[in-house]
C-alpha cells in the first residue's frame, strides 16, 4: 500500500506564464489531517487554466493547474469521515465547510475557505503537498489535477456514485455545473423567457442547456466563431449571432431582435469586461438580469453608465453556478446517471494526459469545446 508514503508520479508543471506544460516526475506527500489523496483518472481542460498560462490570472509559480477532474481516493488523512480509499470522487475548487455564514445561508455558496483570488497555491496549513527536486510546487485553487495524484482538503472533495463514468462526470467539477447553474440558480430563468448567452464554449453551452431546462422560449447564442453555432443549436439555442456580422454594437442587435425590448436574461461566459457591459446593456432596461459567469482578468476594472442599472436591471455574478458544492455534486452526478441532462456533446476530444499541450492548442484555436485528459 502507498498510504502514509510519499508517491512519485507524473505531473504537468507550468514554470512561468506563456510557457507550455512540462511533464516531470514530482513527489506527492501523504494527506495531512482532514485531507484526501486522490488518484486522478480524468481531467477536463477549462479556459480558467488557460487564463493562468496567458498571464490573465496571477498565481504563484511553479504550479500544477487543472480543477475539473474525477478520480479515486488513494488514502485519507486523520479525521476524514466522508470518504474512504477506493471511493470515486470529484475534487471541487469551491469548498463547502458547512460552518461559515455563506455555507449556512440558503443562497450562499462561496465558502469562506474558497480561494478565488488572490491565489496562494497552498492548502489550509499554508504549505503544498507537491515537490519537484525538493522544492515546493503550488496547487491551483486547492485542486491541481493535471497530475496522476493530488491532495485536497476533505471539504473540497465530493464522493460520487460508484458507477459514474469519470471521463464524463469530471465536467460536473467545473464547466457544466458553472454554466447550467448560472441559468437555473443564479438567474432563475423563467419558462417562456428570452435569454442571450455570450460565449459558446463548454460553460456557455452548459448555460444554453440550463436555459432550455428552465423552459426559456428563445435562447440566442453569441460568438465570433460561427463554427460553434451548430452545437449550440443542438443543445437548445434557437438562433445564433456573430457580432462581427454587424456594424452596430451587439446590444443594439439584440434589442432589434426582441422588438426593442431586450432579453430577460443575459449571460457573459467569456471573461472580458467589454462583453460584460454589452451583456448588461442587452437585457430589458427594467426587469432584465445579466449574470457574469466568465472569470474576469486579475485587476481589471469596468466603467459603465449607472443609468443602465438605475432603471431596474439586475447585474450579478455566479461562481460554480450558485451550487453548494458538497451538497449539489452528488445530486448532479445522479441526475446525469438518470439521463436528466447529457454531457457527451460538450466533450469533443479525449486524449492521454501526456498530450496536454495539444489539448490546450485545441482550446485556443477554437477547435474544441471540452478536451478530457485521461490517465
From Swiss-Prot:
GO terms for molecular function: all-trans-retinol dehydrogenase (NAD+) activity; zinc ion binding. The modification N-acetylserine is found at residue 1. Its cofactor is Zn(2+). Binds 2 Zn(2+) ions per subunit. Gene3D superfamilies: Medium-chain alcohol dehydrogenases, catalytic domain, NAD(P)-binding Rossmann-like Domain. The keyword Zinc applies. It is an enzyme of class 1 (oxidoreductase). It catalyses: a primary alcohol + NAD(+) = an aldehyde + NADH + H(+); a secondary alcohol + NAD(+) = a ketone + NADH + H(+). Zn(2+) 1 binds at residues 46, 67, 174. The keyword Acetylation applies. It is found in: Cytoplasm. Its main location: cytoplasm. In U.hardwickii there are two isozymes of alcohol dehydrogenase I. It holds the Pfam family ADH_zinc_N. Belongs to the zinc-containing alcohol dehydrogenase family. Class-I subfamily. It comes from the Eukaryota. NAD(+) binds at residues 199-204, 223, 228, 293-295, 370. This is Alcohol dehydrogenase 1B. Its EC number is 1.1.1.1. One of its GO terms (biological process) is retinol metabolic process. GO terms for cellular component: cytosol. It comes from Saara hardwickii (Indian spiny-tailed lizard). Multimeric (with different ratios of monomers). InterPro entries: ADH-like_C, ADH-like_N, ADH_Zn_CS, GroES-like_sf, NAD(P)-bd_dom_sf, PKS_ER. Keywords: Acetylation, Cytoplasm, Metal-binding, NAD, Oxidoreductase, Zinc.
Amino acid at each position: 500500500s502507498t498510504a502514509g508514503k510519499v508517491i512519485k508520479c507524473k505531473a504537468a508543471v507550468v514554470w512561468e506564464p506563456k510557457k507550455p506544460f512540462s511533464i516531470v516526475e514530482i513527489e506527492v506527500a501523504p494527506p495531512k489531517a482532514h485531507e484526501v489523496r486522490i488518484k486522478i483518472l480524468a481531467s477536463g481542460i477549462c479556459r480558467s487554466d488557460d487564463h493562468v498560462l496567458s498571464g490573465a490570472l496571477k498565481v504563484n509559480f511553479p504550479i500544477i493547474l487543472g480543477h475539473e477532474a474525477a478520480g479515486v481516493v488513494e488514502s485519507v488523512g486523520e479525521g476524514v469521515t466522508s470518504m474512504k480509499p477506493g471511493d470515486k470522487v470529484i475534487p471541487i475548487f469551491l469548498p463547502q465547510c458547512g460552518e461559515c455564514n455563506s455555507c449556512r445561508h440558503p443562497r450562499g455558496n462561496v465558502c469562506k475557505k474558497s480561494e478565488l483570488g488572490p491565489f496562494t497555491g497552498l492548502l489550509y496549513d499554508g504549505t503544498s503537498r507537491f515537490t519537484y527536486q525538493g522544492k515546493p510546487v503550488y496547487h491551483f485553487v486547492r485542486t491541481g489535477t493535471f497530475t496522476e495524484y493530488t491532495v485536497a482538503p476533505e471539504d473540497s472533495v465530493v464522493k460520487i456514485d460508484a458507477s459514474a463514468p469519470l471521463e464524463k462526470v469530471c465536467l460536473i467539477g467545473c464547466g457544466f455545473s458553472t454554466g447550467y447553474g448560472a441559468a437555473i440558480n443564479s438567474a432563475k430563468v423563467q419558462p417562456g423567457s428570452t435569454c442571450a448567452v455570450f460565449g459558446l464554449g463548454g460553460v456557455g453551452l452548459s448555460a444554453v442547456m440550463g436555459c432550455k431546462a428552465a423552459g426559456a422560449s428563445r435562447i440566442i447564442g453569441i460568438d465570433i466563431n460561427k463554427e460553434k453555432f451548430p452545437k449550440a443549436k443542438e443543445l437548445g439555442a434557437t438562433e445564433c449571432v456573430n457580432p462581427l456580422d454587424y456594424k452596430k454594437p451587439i446590444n443594439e442587435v439584440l434589442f432589434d431582435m426582441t422588438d426593442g425590448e431586450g432579453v430577460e436574461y443575459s449571460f457573459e461566459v467569456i471573461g472580458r469586461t467589454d462583453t460584460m457591459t454589452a451583456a448588461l446593456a442587452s437585457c430589458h432596461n427594467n426587469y432584465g438580469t445579466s449574470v457574469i459567469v466568465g472569470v474576469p482578468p486579475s485587476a481589471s476594472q469596468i466603467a459603465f453608465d449607472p443609468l443602465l442599472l438605475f432603471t431596474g436591471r439586475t447585474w450579478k455574478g455566479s461562481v460554480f453556478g450558485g451550487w453548494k458544492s458538497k451538497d449539489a455534486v452528488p445530486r448532479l452526478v445522479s441526475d446525469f446517471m438518470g439521463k436528466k441532462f447529457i454531457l457527451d456533446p460538450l466533450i469533443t476530444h479525449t486524449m492521454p494526459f501526456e498530450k496536454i499541450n495539444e489539448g490546450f492548442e485545441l482550446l485556443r484555436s477554437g477547435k474544441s469545446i471540452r478536451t478530457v485528459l485521461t490517465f
